[in-house]
Amino acid sequence: MPPGTKGDPSNVTQPLPCLPSAEEDAIKVFVRIRPPVEGTLTGVDGEQGLCLTALSSTTIRLHSKPEPKMFTFDHVANVDTNQESVFSSVAKNIVESCMNGYNGTIFAYGQTGSGKTFTMLGPSESDNFTHNLRGVIPRSFEYLFFLINREKEKAGEGKSFLCKCSFIEIYNEQIFDLLDSASAGLFLREHIKKGVFVVGAVEQVVTSAAEAYQVLSMGWRNRRVASTSMNRESSRSHAVFTVTIESMEKTNDLVNIRSSQLNLVDLAGSERQKDTQTEGVRLKEAGSINRSLSCLGQVITALVDVANGRQRHICYRDSKLTFLLRDSLGGNAKTFYIANVHPGSKCFGETLSTLQFAQRAKLIKNKAVVNEDTQGNVSQLQAEVKKLKEQLSQLLSGQMPGDISVARVPSVGDNNMDYMNNFIEAMMILEKSDREKKVLLQKVVQLEDLCNKKEKFIQSNKMIVKFREDHISRLEKAHKEGRISLSNNEQDDFIAELKEEIRTLKEQVEHHPRVAKYALENHSLREENKRLHSLQSVKRAQEVTAQMIAELEKAFLEVSVSEKDRQVAPMHSTPIQLDNNSLMSAARMRERMLQLESELATSKQEYEEFKELTKKKQVEQESELQSLIKSNQHLENILEAIKANKRHEVSQLNRMHAAETIKNMTTPTKSYNLRSRLVPRLSPDAMPNGLMDTPKSGDVMDDIINEPIPPEMSEQAYEAIAEELRIVQEQVTALQAKLDEEEGKNIRLQQQVNKLELCSTQIQELFNSERSNWNKEQQDLIAQIKSLEKQKQENKSQEDVLKSEVHDLRVVLQSADRELGAVKGEYSLYREKQEKELSQLSARHMDVQLQLDNVRLEHETLLEEKRSLQDAFDNLEEVMKFEIDQLKQEISDSKHENETLRAEFSNLLELLETEKERRQKLTSQLEEDKENKTKELLQVVDENMHLRKQCSELMTKCEQQVTELHGLEHSLTSSKEMIADLEKKNTADKEVVADLMNQIQVHRTTIIHKTESIDLLTRELEDIHSKYSIVLLAKEESKTVIEEQEKQIEELRECLERKQSADNIEKELLCDDLAHATEELEKLTEAFNKQEALLHTHEKELVEKEQQISELTNQVKLMTDLEISREQEKIRPASSNSSSPVVLPETPRTPEGNPYDSEIANLQKRNTNLEILVSELNEERTSKNEEIIRLKMQLCETENMRLEIQNLQGMCKELKSQLENCNNVMKDSNDQKPSDMQDLKREIEKEVSERMEKGKATEHILKLQAELEETRNILCTKDHSLNELSKEIERTRSLEAKAFTEKEEIRSILEGKYEETEKLSHELDMLRKQVLFLAEENGKILGHQNPNQKIQYLVKLKKENNKLLEEAEKLRIENLFLKESKKCEHCN
């Protein structure tokens, strides 16, 4: 279904931009709006004809009531979007990903008649696969085979492709093969590797786009299509066209196979029976279509719930469509939805459901994976597996794959521990970095504050300079004007300026950078103090001390309680009374006391050390604090001095300004007097006389003084003043800088002196306090020693008592053994009973669990049904609101139109009466002037013709009004019926919802009762388990005490045997590895020499080929520019010839090549050969690197072995000591096992000798390591050269990819131009038809040239006019009758 009608062209030619994706595998949605059919209302932004508008390229607005709804998608295509832009936005990326091994799917979804088939295939014509308006599927074929040919050209014979096509349809939930017209209903099956597939579907191999077109057209003829009231060719089934792409790439002996599927799906549109008016078979088809689409919607909602973290069952198997496309919905595929919507207001409900469906689908995320398989001979595959395992082990151990550093290789058992350690270290580093980041951010804020203060300081300096310059300029102006004394206003202004300058100086002092710097240092010192207090060692020491104090207090309480009990108890107790005071408890208490004493001593030492450290740090910090306080006070004094100095400077400046003004006023006169005195000296005769007479001649002096000062002299004076000022300012600044430096030095020295003084005083205080503390501690220790001696004597007396008690306890133990045997028998009987009860309870528990699961499933199904009903109810409610509003608008419009029509009808009646009168007058005039005024008769006849036309128009209008009135009455009755039906449905839905709510409440109550019963059962089970565990613990404790000594001896023997066997195996493996390493070193050196020669030759060839490539690329660019200019010149004359029929060139299904394609192909082949050579070299390099890594791993293993040997030697020593202890124990217990211990000693000595031999082997391996390092350095240089070659190859690849993208852009632009020309040709045809029709009409009008023919024509018109008048009168009478009947109805 095309936009507009089937086959109508679109209007926009600009390509759409590629869609941005937030996540790579999320389902993307493209919304396309179908243009409205010609003749329908096409209002703008919510007028009567449209129910939605596209606001931008990603947002769409639905005109729902009471407020419009906004939807956002990946892209929204408006009415004027063309087919090429849809393909470039939707299918291009999917086809490219299919070439890379990913599965891809494109869906077209929407209501019937919304343009799905037009979007996917194109217009419904025979040549739709070569038409300029062809759809997404034909364009995908062209692009796919173009990419395949490009890959074949690049890879040569090393890569091959196989494409297979299948075309099926799902009709009434049955699968049919469209490529086999005789096929019956097919079945779906599931395979582990293939996934879901159709059994027996024909798969045809295709090698070009033309063959794929043939397959598609052959299947399309068999597809079920029928006409409905909404669409002339409506799809009655879901069509799925699948292209399977298999690529096979051979590299050496390995074969890499990639397979992918491209599913192009044209879904049948959702239908409503009242809109399509289907019956019989068509109604059944619509039901099955709607059922499968509702299943698709349920699957999508379930997938959205799963993505949000809810556990849901996804019902793929409820529909054949969802089961077949399972991977495309939340599986292994990249999916694109094209949602086609109709903008008409009649399709509001379906448009809303389509947009909601697309919005839900946008939330689904697929997990696309490259479908790849590798085949080859066993040796190659084993090498590949080995390489991958090594990379995996390096990644697990925290190394990069390319890192060739010697590191310890962890064993398989230690991998998890290493991973955990690495993880913990990483988390610690992260926390540390976060803390450092916070500290640095605080510092940055402080530095920014300091910078702001410096800027303010600079601004204040500028303001001061500005004030001074203004003052100087004002004084100069006053001097020029000749007035020295200032007025009151000027004095006030001057005072205000001085006050402003003082204020700026104060701000300068406040924002002085030194003050800010000292504040920053103070803040950092406080932070350091906090950090020292929050150190882990300090906290740990405090925790340890607190724990020790608590333990000591607990022990003291226990001892005091036991002493009280002993005092109360009699001295000689019977064995039954002394059951609680056993010998074991006494031994434990002794051990505990010893442990506590040792821990107390260590904790005291740690506490003292920590105390000393903290005291030292506290002293340092206090001294620093005191020095900072003093420095702060000193700075405050400096600030006060600066303020006073500034005030003094201001007063001095005022005086200087006054003095300078006086100087400026006086200096010009003086200089002028001097000049006038020197004038007489110019004449030699009057020189002595002039010198003598100048003071005497007063009149002459007055004349000179009264003369005006020349401007040159005043300028010289001003320049001299300015230079003096500048020199003074420079001197002041230099002195200020020196003063600042001296002040800084003074402050630092003062701080150091203060620090030293404080340190000395605090150290003296500490020394005195520590001396007093030591004296107190010494006295306390003496008192403790005395108390401990007393306790020792008491303990000796207690030991004597306990020895006597031991004998009694042994007798008690024998009786306890007898009792234990009886208890064991009772326990076995009790255990059997408990097991029976447990089995019964477990069976009951399983039954209850099954019932619970059933109830949960029922609850979930009810919730799903409720949700679906609620969604349907909401949609119906919105549709009802929208339709009611539309009907109200239509009724109001029809009323308004009726009123206008009535007014027009009355006007027309009046006109008719006037026309009648006029006609009567004209007829009388005609009878009187028949013979004399033929010309006037002709004019009257013309007017009569005009009146006839008006009458005919009035008649047609009346007829239309009558029909419209009938239609409005019918629409009113139908709308009333619809409202009644909707109200009934609403009430029915409310009743259903109420029933469902009641059922849910009943189920909830049953669930609550069942949960309570389950809780009771679980409590009973827990009680039984606790009793059972208590009994088991008692039994295990009794067993462990008996079996521990036997296990220790057996474990020692087994450990020794294991270590001996492991050492022998390791020794043999090391010898084999050494021999293998020497052989591989020799092979590596030979291969290395060969590689050097090969590299030199390849470098020369690469330089030559780069020159050739640069020359050819320049030629290709020139040729492409020429071709583009030629094509533009061809297009221009084609567009200018509007009168001639437009002959469009057939669009190439695959892009055509230019004359230099062969040269580019040769270059590409050379490039591929170079790539193959480089890949071979890289493989050899990687294999050698692997060998080096393996050798280094062996070296690491040997080092580890050496370390283990050392550890084992230490263990052996420990074992010797343990064995000596064991010997002593065994001599006491058994005198029959000395031979076994001697054998163990001999075995240990053998192990030590073997370890020594292994040490010698490690030395030999270290020598090999040095040789390997030399070879590694040589290989690094070769790697560098290889990297340069690979960079060059990457550069050529990027240039080729750039050229390809440019070519594709030009092709898409050309496609758009072709579509535009098609549209223009269609418009030309329409205009030609209109011109022909107008020419015919004009010929009819101009045909009556004879006056007799005109008179006959007028007579005919007169007769027709009379008939029309009669009919008009009849219609008027009928209209009056209708009005009266309506009035009667209203009265009734």
Curated annotation (Swiss-Prot):
Coiled-coil spans are 369-1383
Q: Where is this region: Necessary for its targeting to microtubule minus ends?
A: 1139-1388
* Organism domain of life: Eukaryota
Q: Which GO biological process annotations does it have?
A: centrosome separation; microtubule-based movement; mitotic spindle assembly
Record's Gene Ontology CC terms? centrosome; cytoplasm; cytosol; microtubule; spindle pole
Entry's InterPro entries? HMMR_C (IPR031794), KIF15/KIN-12 (IPR044986), Kinesin_motor_CS (IPR019821), Kinesin_motor_dom (IPR001752), Kinesin_motor_dom_sf (IPR036961), P-loop_NTPase (IPR027417)
Ranges for the region named Disordered are 1127-1156
| Entry's localization field | Cytoplasm; Cytoplasm, Cytoskeleton, Microtubule organizing center, Centrosome; Cytoplasm, Cytoskeleton, Spindle; Cytoplasm, Cytoskeleton, Spindle pole
* GO-annotated molecular function: ATP binding; microtubule binding; plus-end-directed microtubule motor activity
Q: In which tissues is it expressed?
A: Strongly expressed in testis and weakly in lung (at protein level).
Residues reported to bind ATP: 110-117
CDD domains found in the cross-reference section:
KISc_KLP2_like (cd01373)
Quaternary state and partners of this protein?
Answer: Homodimer. Dimerization is required for targeting to microtubule minus ends. Found in a complex with tpx2 and microtubules. Its association with microtubules and targeting to microtubule minus ends requires tpx2.
Instruction: Give the similarity note.
Output: Belongs to the TRAFAC class myosin-kinesin ATPase superfamily. Kinesin family. KLP2 subfamily.
Function per UniProt: Plus-end directed kinesin-like motor enzyme involved in mitotic spindle assembly. Required for centrosome separation and maintenance of spindle bipolarity during mitosis.
Q: What is this protein called?
A: Kinesin-like protein KIF15-A
Organism field: Xenopus laevis
